[in-house]
Amino acid sequence: MVADRRLIAYAQLGLGNRMRVILSSLAYARSQNRDLEYVWDSSVGMKPALTDLWRFPYRRVSPLRSRLLQLTGHGYLKDRIAEWPSDVDRKPLIQVKTVHALKDAAGEPIDWGPQLRELETTPAVQDRVFRIWNDRLAGRPYIGVQIRAHDAHPKTVEASPVEWFIGRMQELRADNPDVEFFLSSDSEAATKQVIDAVGPVAVQTDIGDYHTTKRVQAAVADLYLLGGAAGVLGPYWSSFVPIARRLADDAIVVEDSRNDHRLSAVGLEGPSVADPLRPWERMNDRADSA
């Protein structure tokens, strides 16, 4: 890379927003012969660094440094970047500040899945993944369930109540009593409600408080376990499950209360992946309906 050709990606808000900005920026930077640097803004209370979650060998820039660069003529490209400025290639430094994935030089959406799949999780995340995997999921078919009930978008709360998940889980269990569920939930109350109605499920319990390092590491572990499922019941209007789908290289079907997909547990007999840290390497069964 040429040392003075850089792209700084300013990441903020939730994990899904941050990762799609940083990883699409990484893909764009590579395509344009630029070095990637990134801002991991902790002003919203996000305690962990990106390097607490994945090994990420790129330079982190402070929000203050990024804002000073803005004041000295390196302004942010913001929001949905549909078209790069005509002179962008001549700029030694580009700063992007958005919650959306970038588009490439031709204006097409960047597929940042390959960059996600090349990341290596930290030992703390790996330990969480294998604790759940070895205890309840290894060698079994399972369906992922991801519930957003804490500080969720109003569209998510309205369209994806806990009762909808419970109803679908009961139907899937009736189809195949041997199917296990892996539950990813951001609410202890929702987790209890599911277990009371459906019975025991695979779920992380020692997850810590919202936005703490422990909690976000647990969320990353959830992503890999959801990615290794035969299919996922997910919330409407959420950026979390799409990360798991990219980890699986789009091999999992995601059903929510508003889309046309419908999972089936009929005929699921074995695991979908052999290594939960590599959910893109699929084995056989998938839970999509005909």
Residue ranges and their predicted role:
Residues L53-F56, D196-D206, D250-I252, L268-R278:
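Active-site regions of enzymes building and remodeling cell-envelope glycoconjugates
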